[in-house]
Amino acid sequence: WQKAHMIYPDGQPQKIKVRLNGDNPTNWAFHRKSWRVKLKKNRLINNSRVFNYTLPQEEEWKNYLPNYLAKRAGVLAPKVNLVELYINDKSQGIYHELEKIDESFLRNRKIMPVNIYKGEWVNRDRKVIIGLDLFNNPASWSKVAVLGLARESDSSDLEYFLELVKLSETSESSFARLKRVARYEDWARFAAFQTLVQSSHNSSLANMRLVSDPWKGTIRPIIHDIKSFLSLQLQP
């Protein structure tokens, strides 16, 4: 992290910390880079402390529109804004401003402090000699938010869910339990949304985020780094 200042919505400069964001070289290897900004705990913006400023891929709407539609569809997704980013008074062009998926993300949606799991199998998160399917191995997941006083290393809730996924292929009783943990209304809405925006970017290989709520005994997906493969055909 590097020290910096940012102009707040009230026009006043405030101390912040900033660093490059993302594992993929496309985020930081070129002139325009993706950034992560961390605010002071007592100087939050819209009840969020950490924001990601990411580079649009191709047309700006292909990243922005899916996140906007996710909220309308009732799918968990970070808030996104199209902003013009300035660094040292020089415009860097249009960026996506996204809230980070963390404890603040939960609080902003009136969700009790619970576990959020990150599933990635590419770039620095890639582990050798282990299969590529995230849903086959709990060791391929890490926590980005922790339930109350629970230990960060405790992933028993995730292990239970993944075990149910495997057992459900041959066991009706396990499938019945899985339907209570992974509710149809959560996962069907997630799948329908992916079909709507024509995206499979959240998959068993990468970009998976799960909210595990031990109080309710449920696990549901979060939209992360979604990309739409729709094309706009301009009419003459």
Residue ranges and their predicted role:
Residues 1-65:
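Conserved NTP-binding catalytic cores of kinases and kinase-like/nucleotidyltransferase enzymes
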Residues 12-17, 86-87, 108:
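Carboxylate/His-rich catalytic cores and anion/metal-binding grooves
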Residues 54-90:
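A conserved helix-loop-beta module that forms one wall/lid of the active-site cleft
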Residues 74-78, 90-189:
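Internal "kinase-insert"/substrate-recognition segments embedded within catalytic cores
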Residues 182-191, 206-207, 218-220:
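Alpha-helical scaffolds flanking conserved acidic
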Residues 193-195:
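Conserved, well-ordered alpha-helix/loop/beta-strand core segments that scaffold catalytic motifs
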Residues 199-236:
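Catalytic activation segment of kinase domains across protein kinase-like and atypical kinase folds
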